[in-house]
Amino acid sequence: SILDNVIGSTTFKKADLCAHTWKYKSPGCAFTSENLLAKAGGEIAAKKVEEKLSTYYQKAGFSSSNTYFKFNEDGTFNAKIDGKSWSGTYTFDEKTHAIDLKGRLLLSLNGFATKNTSGISILFESKKLLTIIQTLTALSGNTTLGTIGEISKNYDGIRVGFDLSK
């Protein structure tokens, strides 16, 4: 459904977030409002962005075995991004789906966690996602990753990241 591409369009509780270890499935993309999704060309725009991200994510080496998130009821999280461990604390707002991750290396990310048809999506502004990936993977010279930051500049209100499944 088109609403799968709009953040906050479904009910999502902290208990749902904490229910599983969420493993990388594919690139994720959603818009912050139905209006912005419609302006961008709807699901077609979201699919285009996901296809582009897929190419870059494959080159970067993301897989279900090396990229995952585990959220705990006590407000802590453990994650691996391309095999690099990242852990810390988080807050999650069930109304807005805003998630704030504060981790080691002074890395923090504000984004959104939302339910989709096959699991959840964890999504961020592309430049913030790029910073985390570069810092954790030491791939700052990798031109593939640089493109991730460029992908969304043509779309207002888009967030990118990871679609995750159980």
Q: Where are the model-predicted features located?
A:
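Lipid interaction determinants
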Residues: 1-74, 78-80, 84-86, 94-166
